[in-house]
Amino acid sequence: MGVHLLGNELSRWDEVDSGSLLLTFFSDERPLRGAAGLADWRLCGRLSRLIKRGHLSGAVGEKLLLPPGRRLPFRSVLIFGLGPSQGFNEEIYRSHVRWIREVADKARLGTYALQPPGRATGLIGARRALELWLDEAAQDSRTAEVAIIDNQSGQKDMAEILRYQQKKRQAAERA
């Protein structure tokens, strides 16, 4: 499994070669924020319309696969409902990560980009979100290439962890 960072800016997304975009949002998160909000804007409000019409709610366990249209550089868009934001904690974060990784694996997504659950609303810090993501990833055999979407300050915090991981791997290879 490879992990790298992707800016939460549309210009950065336009540089992406392929893969899928995985979006997460809470049932009480309106308007959509972070990556989901940017994708909604790029899709001319399609996600907001789906929510308004009752076809998408953000309920826990909800998932929806959409074509990306011409305005997103991804092969597909997969949306995950996280349920209510109240009570969100690390245990719930971990369960969402396991579920998202399982669905991505079953869908045979070899490459995908996502903003970790709770990052858009600030319910989990960037550094901790990546630490827990890597911890969950270490416990399974899935090998997808993952681009973690975050803002500049979040990327800065996450980059430290990725550099440390890389140094650990290099040291292990030399030993």
Spans of model-derived segments:
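Glycine-/small-residue-enriched capping loops at alpha/beta junctions
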Residues: 1-175
